[in-house]
């Protein structure tokens, strides 16, 4: 892969260093991928656009012809100005690593290839340099050993938070190349919730039934907005994490707007507008405590976004290996994400206790029904996670993007 295209890919991650058009591509791909995944996932969803882009970048490093062009088109990178030798991806990870004491962010990415194929040295070097990713050979014919080896590697890279990522049933004699992405994040709120204020409250699910969930409550100074367009009306709240490196943006449909209406109508311009037009005010926040662990095979979602060639026999991955028998078998991502009251005892400020009788004039943000969320890196506005909560009581979901295929 030539350096011009490589630098174009790296510039894809830029927030402050490149044009506004580059920023837009990040949100564009995130929303596209969310819609593709949500076609078959009607309940809780979480995925990482950043992680998925890294996986596609790892393939693109060694792809040529149609395979490469499909990835470029899906990421909206065709025609991206090139020539600036500055890796924003490296900058992002550098920024994260400098403040590790403030939060936990573990991202493990790897390319696993069937033993017997020879990986080119240039690819090994570039994959490690630009994506901090491992390239490993395994024998997928020994499915049990391969599953154990990959799962153990993922567990070690995520401080034990993501376990048992693979089972032997997921590999077979036709498995050639598997892309693996595992991500864990946990941060301390800049303004934490008081645990003594959390109480069991009804959460109304999409079907109208209710479930009791632990609802965190606090009076916070937060970035807030109320947006109405066509039949989509929602409240948007941004809660920063300690050190102002990351923030959680929650998109809460009003009671007369369903989560499906938001999913159908939301676009990248909506997301960018939400990011830019929030204003600070005092908000009475009620947010359910939840934990989501989700494993996705992104193959079908990428298929629906017209990334198809890399999954076909005979695709040109000659930048990785000279063999014409190599193609991508699976694109696997597993994310562990948790929202709770916890914050740093020493430095984090605390939300104010909400009185039993709330002010009628106070802005209220009551997340007691399904909502979307985005975890972003504040400086670059890179979207690390995107998802939805339809039932905070469900903690673990697994499956393929299109179970019918």
Swiss-Prot record:
List of glycosylated residues: 306
Cited PROSITE patterns: SERPIN
Subcellular location: Secreted
Keyword terms, alphabetized: Glycoprotein, Protease inhibitor, Secreted, Serine protease inhibitor, Signal
Superkingdom classification of source: Eukaryota
InterPro entries found in the cross-reference section: Serpin_CS (IPR023795), Serpin_dom (IPR023796), Serpin_fam (IPR000215), Serpin_sf (IPR036186), Serpin_sf_1 (IPR042178), Serpin_sf_2 (IPR042185)
GO molecular function: serine-type endopeptidase inhibitor activity
Record's GO cellular component terms: collagen-containing extracellular matrix; extracellular space
Pfam families on file: Serpin
Record site: Reactive bond: 357-358
Tissue expression per record: Expressed in pancreas.
Stretch forming the signal peptide: 1-18
SMART domains: SERPIN (SM00093)
Family indicated by similarity: Belongs to the serpin family.
Listed name of the protein: Serpin I2
Naturally occurring in which organism (per UniProt): Mus musculus (Mouse)
Primary gene name: Serpini2
């Amino acid at each position: 892969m030539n350096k011009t295209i490589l630098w174009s890919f790296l510039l894809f991650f830029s927030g402050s260093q490149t044009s506004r058009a580059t920023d837009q591509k990040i949100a564009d791909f995130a929303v596209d991928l969310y819609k593709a995944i949500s076609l078959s996932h009607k309940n809780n969803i979480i995925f990482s656009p950043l992680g998925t882009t890294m996986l596609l970048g790892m393939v693109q490093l060694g792809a040529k012809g149609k395979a490469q062009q499909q990835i470029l088109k899906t990421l909206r990178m065709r025609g991206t100005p090139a020539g600036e030798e500055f890796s924003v991806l490296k900058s992002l990870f550098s920024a994260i690593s400098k403040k590790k004491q403030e939060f936990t962010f573990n991202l493990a990415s790897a390319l696993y290839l069937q033993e017997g194929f020879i990986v080119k040295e240039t690819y090994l070097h570039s994959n490690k340099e630009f994506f901090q990713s491992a390239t490993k050979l395994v024998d997928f014919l020994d499915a049990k050993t391969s599953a154990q080896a990959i799962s153990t590697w993922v567990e070690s890279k995520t401080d034990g938070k993501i376990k048992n990522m693979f089972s032997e049933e997921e590999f077979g004699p036709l498995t050639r190349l598997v892309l693996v992405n595992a991500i864990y994040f946990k941060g301390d709120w800049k303004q934490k919730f008081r645990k003594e204020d959390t109480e069991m409250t009804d959460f109304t699910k999409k079907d109208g039934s209710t479930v009791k969930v632990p609802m965190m409550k606090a009076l916070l100074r937060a970035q807030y907005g109320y947006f109405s367009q066509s039949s989509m009306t929602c409240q948007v709240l941004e809660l920063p994490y300690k050190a102002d490196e990351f923030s959680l943006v929650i998109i809460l449909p009003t009671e007369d707007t369903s989560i499906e209406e938001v999913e159908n109508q939301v676009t990248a311009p909506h997301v960018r507008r939400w990011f830019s037009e929030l204003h600070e005010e005092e908000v009475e926040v009620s947010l359910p405590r939840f934990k989501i662990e989700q494993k996705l095979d992104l193959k079908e979602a990428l298929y629906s976004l017209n990334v198809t060639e890399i999954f076909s026999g005979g695709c040109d991955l000659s930048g990785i290996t000279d063999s014409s028998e190599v193609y991508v078998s699976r694109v696997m991502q597993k994310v562990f994400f948790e929202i709770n009251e916890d914050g740093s005892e020493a430095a984090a400020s605390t939300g104010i206790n909400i009185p039993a009788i709330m002010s009628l004039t106070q802005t209220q943000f009551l997340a007691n029904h399904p909502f979307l969320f985005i975890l972003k890196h504040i400086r670059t506005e890179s979207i690390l996670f995107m998802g939805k909560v339809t039932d905070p009581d469900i903690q673990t979901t697994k499956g393929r993007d299109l179970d019918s295929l």
